[in-house]
């Protein structure tokens, strides 16, 4: 067949495929969390699959009896669209809000049934694994759950027997139940390198996710916890926390990056913005996100985003900034 006889559409398709293959062939991960309720009704043509390697659907949690009542079938178009772009889809359990039902469900007897149900949903709806985001009260905090470790080990065993992934979202300093043996079960770990301060610490009115924090968190996982670099992913926030000018001032609500840059012209180029009445919003702008991406490419295996719907399209996009740095170094 002569090349000149091929239609232009063929070359456009070929170029698109090649670029996609280049994006996914690299071992560097770009992981994004995405709200599960929005995924169920998303216009998949507007989801930036081409700039991601993994999407975590947040959150999939059972009721007190261990039953999952989400409409998983409604996620099928989203999952298929992701797979078309070679993006893996994981169901994330837990979340920042306290999920007290897991304490009972992680106990002997109920734990095995919970794992069975999780694996069933993953296999039935062709997801790629489970992301464990059990936070305060389980993996860290004043109290932890003694069954966290055995749950992770048994979950990993069940998922890996089906060639599925098990990952985690863990804080800067996880609790003592997160042992080296537990850490070794995860295919990779998303370090939640944010919320170092916030409304709960009004005396620390500063950036909750500085570049310095990111360096310290990566160093802790590499040097203290001895986690191999190819299992670590650096988390970055697409939101900010605000503080008043004095300790007596009420803390203003947090804002998404989308809200910040849509309201204040030029806010994408800095890490804080002075709001009316003396308040200051602290977040990560494009330069810091690019610097963190460079840090991640040098020291760990990827970068994670909380969360994708907090971003904006176009030149102000933080995901675009991440992708520009990551693709330039591939």
Enumerate the language-model features and the residues they cover:
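Active-site and adjacent substrate-binding regions of carbohydrate-active enzymes
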Residues: 133-166, 172, 288-330
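Short, well-ordered coil/turn segments that N-cap beta-strands
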Residues: 26-28, 53, 85-89, 126-128, ...
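Substrate-binding surface in catalytic domains of secreted glycosidases
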Residues: 65-73, 116, 137-262
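Glycan-binding loop/region signatures in secreted carbohydrate-active enzymes
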Residues: 230-299, 320-330
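A cross-domain feature marking catalytic cores of carbohydrate-active enzymes
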Residues: 34-36, 59, 91-95, 134-136, ...
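Bacterial Sec-dependent N-terminal signal peptides
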Residues: 1-24
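Conserved, mostly hydrophobic/aromatic
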Residues: 55, 91, 132, 189, ...
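Glycan-recognition patch characteristic of GH18 chitinases/ENGases
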Residues: 23-122, 207, 212, 327
């Amino acid at each position: 067949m002569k090349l000149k006889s091929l239609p232009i559409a063929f070359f456009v398709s070929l170029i698109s495929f090649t670029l996609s293959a280049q994006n996914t062939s690299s071992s560097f991960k770009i992981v994004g969390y995405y709200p599960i309720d929005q995924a169920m009704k998303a216009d998949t043509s507007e989801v930036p699959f081409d700039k991601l390697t993994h999407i975590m659907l947040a959150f999939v949690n059972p009721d007190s009896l261990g039953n999952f009542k989400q409409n998983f079938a409604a996620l099928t178009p989203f999952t298929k669209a992701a797979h078309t772009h070679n993006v893996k889809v994981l169901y994330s359990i837990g979340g920042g809000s306290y999920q007290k039902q897991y304490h009972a469900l992680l106990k002997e007897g109920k734990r095995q049934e919970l794992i069975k149900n999780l694996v069933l949903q993953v296999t039935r709806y062709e997801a790629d694994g489970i992301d464990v985001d059990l936070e305060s009260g389980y993996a860290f905090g004043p109290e932890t759950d003694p069954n966290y470790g055995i749950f992770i080990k048994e979950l990993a065993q069940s998922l890996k027997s089906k060639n599925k992934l098990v990952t985690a979202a863990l804080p800067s300093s996880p609790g003592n139940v997160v042992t080296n043996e537990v850490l070794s079960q995860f295919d990779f770990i998303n370090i939640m390198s944010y919320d170092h301060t916030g409304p709960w610490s009004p005396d620390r009115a500063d950036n909750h996710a500085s570049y310095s924090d990111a360096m310290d968190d990566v160093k802790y996982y590499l040097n203290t916890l001895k986690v191999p670099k190819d299992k670590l992913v650096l988390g970055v926030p697409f939101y900010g926390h605000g503080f008043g000018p004095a300790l007596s001032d009420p803390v203003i609500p947090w804002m998404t990056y989308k809200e910040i840059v849509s309201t204040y012209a030029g806010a994408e180029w800095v890490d804080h913005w002075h709001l009316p009445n003396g308040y200051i919003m602290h977040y990560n702008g494009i330069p810091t996100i690019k610097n963190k991406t460079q840090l991640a490419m040098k020291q760990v295996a990827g970068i994670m985003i909380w969360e994708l719907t907090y971003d904006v399209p176009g030149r102000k996009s933080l995901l675009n900034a991440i992708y520009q740095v990551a693709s330039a170094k591939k």
